[in-house]
């Protein structure tokens, strides 16, 4: 009896180890083209991230004054460059001459100033990296959704890039305006609401007829404020939305779910994402995470 139990315990341990050892390794996605290693959203950053074995590149796009999709994130050029004002105030050819590495610092130094790192267009990037998959975050603070969708479709068609791009935005209007041919994530609001219902009410709200491929993206952990309304007022409390096994099971209750976790900062984060079975992780430094991927 004792011998049998000992063998059973050994088998259980081996089984657990096997599951952990063969967990799917998430796709390493370079956030803002690898903002932790180089000036964000530049061709230089893309090249470095690919050298550091990133599986895909996440870039941020806005529309220039002449309606050309360009790679830039903040609402003011002063945040990252040697110029100021919104991206939409300048033509793409002007933006290409601005110093996109001006504000990037390393140990109180600015190693990328005056190195010729301009703001590239989406078309230039897709053409230069024909074998790379790009996740494209739409960040224009003032673009017309319909016009932006038209310009994006034009670029993707010219570069034959419909199958190697997928779009994301915190503004659902930008996603809704995209034509059917353009791949996209589910809306952030929808994803957050589903996760909140799982975390707080243990309620799984996957529609019964959901059986198509779909992509979800959200922070692995996110602080939120819960507002409860009553007849005589309301109550506010802090909470944390967290991806766990219950959440993963719910989101994958129907086939076709692909889950990308944001805000992965440490090796522990990466291990947790891997154990959860995440399909992708958004990281600032592919250089750092390439070492974790092989562990």
Task: Label each region the model flagged.
Residues 22-295:
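Phosphate-group recognition and catalysis centered on beta-loop-alpha active-site segments
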Residues 2-10:
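Bacterial N-terminal signal peptides that target proteins for export
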Residues 18-20:
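N-terminal signal peptide c-region/cleavage motif recognized by signal peptidases
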Residues 13-16:
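Intrinsically disordered, low-complexity, mixed-charge
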